[in-house]
């Protein structure tokens, strides 16, 4: 095995992938809650709130890929597209809606 393959195997080891997913989940959880609070404070309603979430959620994921993964998410995740964009989507939209209604109730 060449040294490049050994390095890739170490980076893509199960423990490292789990740690990377935890860090990504923290970023996504924090972002979803902040986006929900801001949407509530701005009194965004209905479909506009969900569009707000979808656009900014994807933008934050792209920033994560560019800044943290340095445009090489395959080095850090076994299935980058699924792991970054889809795996925790319903978890994040639930947190967003919770924070959105809380922020909306505080202002309204």
Swiss-Prot record:
Q: Give TM segment ranges.
A: 24-44, 49-69, 88-106
How this chain sits in the membrane, per its record, is:
Multi-pass membrane protein
One Gene Ontology cellular component term attached to this UniProt record is: EMC complex
Q: How does it assemble?
A: Component of the ER membrane protein complex (EMC), which is composed of EMC1, EMC2, EMC3, EMC4, EMC5 and EMC6.
| Keywords in alphabetical order | Endoplasmic reticulum, Membrane, Transmembrane, Transmembrane helix
| UniProt KW tRNA processing keyword | no
Q: Please indicate the ranges of residues that lie on the Lumenal side.
A: 45-48, 107-108
Write out the topological domains of type Cytoplasmic: 1-23, 70-87
- Annotated GO biological process: autophagosome assembly; phospholipid metabolic process; phospholipid transport; protein folding in endoplasmic reticulum; protein insertion into ER membrane by stop-transfer membrane-anchor sequence
Would the keyword RNA-binding be found if you checked this record's keyword annotation? no
InterPro entries, from UniProt? Emc6, EMC6-like
Query: What organism does this protein naturally occur in?
Result: Saccharomyces cerevisiae (strain ATCC 204508 / S288c)
Query: Pfam families given for it?
Result: EMC6
* Name of the protein: ER membrane protein complex subunit 6
The family assignment reads:
Belongs to the EMC6 family.
Instruction: Give a short account of what the protein does.
Output: Part of the endoplasmic reticulum membrane protein complex (EMC) that enables the energy-independent insertion into endoplasmic reticulum membranes of newly synthesized membrane proteins. Preferentially accommodates proteins with transmembrane domains that are weakly hydrophobic or contain destabilizing features such as charged and aromatic residues. Involved in the cotranslational insertion of multi-pass membrane proteins in which stop-transfer membrane-anchor sequences become ER membrane spanning helices.
Compartments where located: Endoplasmic reticulum membrane
């Amino acid at each position: 095995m060449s040294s490049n393959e050994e390095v890739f195997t170490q980076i893509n080891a199960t423990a490292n992938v789990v740690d990377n997913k935890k860090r990504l989940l923290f970023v996504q959880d924090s972002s979803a809650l902040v986006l929900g609070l801001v949407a509530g404070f701005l009194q965004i309603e209905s479909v506009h709130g969900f569009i707000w979430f979808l656009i900014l959620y994807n933008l934050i994921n792209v920033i994560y890929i560019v800044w943290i993964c340095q445009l090489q998410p395959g080095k850090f995740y076994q299935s980058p597209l699924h792991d970054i964009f889809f795996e925790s989507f319903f978890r994040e939209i639930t947190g967003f809606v919770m924070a959105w209604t809380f922020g909306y109730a505080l202002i309204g």
